[in-house]
Amino acid sequence: LFHAPATQQAKIIMHVTPLSGISTEALDALLDDAFGRDRHLRTAYLLRKGMVAIDHLSFGILDNDICVVSIQCWPVRVQHADLILVGPVAVATDRQNSGLGKQLMHLMLDATTPQDPPMVMIGDPEYYGRFGFSSAGTGGWTLPGPWEPRRLLLRNSAMAELPAQGTLGPAD
């Protein structure tokens, strides 16, 4: 449970739940708020097309049954190497800079197991570097849509051997 500061009207209690426990409508409303209605045109959507989110690594934070923060993780691959695509990490616009996104990132990372493959994401290295993500090791990778190479980030804490080149895409 997360406890937000009490307001004059009511105390707000937020709780973390697996993403599978959040309605599609509530999640879509959050994603539209955080990224816009045209979010489906982004390259990250091509990477996870047809995939099902990884349940033990995908969460949301509910505030009075409204999803205000979510993180999703997806199975992807570069050549024959399995990876976990992290994202989207969505925070409602009225909750930006609240620390909830950071808390959910830590929760997701804590939920990883030694058997989980390395993680990749498209994001700001200045922000996600604090979680161990960097563009090191992704310079020879391509994506099925536009992207900025400096924003293709890898977290390979187990130092798994990964291909130097290849196209990132959905796991089969």
State each model region's role:
Residues V86, V91, N97-D110, M121:
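Conserved acetyl-CoA-binding loop-helix of GNAT-fold acetyltransferases
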Residues S98, W147-A158:
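Accessory recognition modules or surfaces
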Residues T113-E148:
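Conserved active-site alpha-helix within GNAT-family acetyltransferase domains
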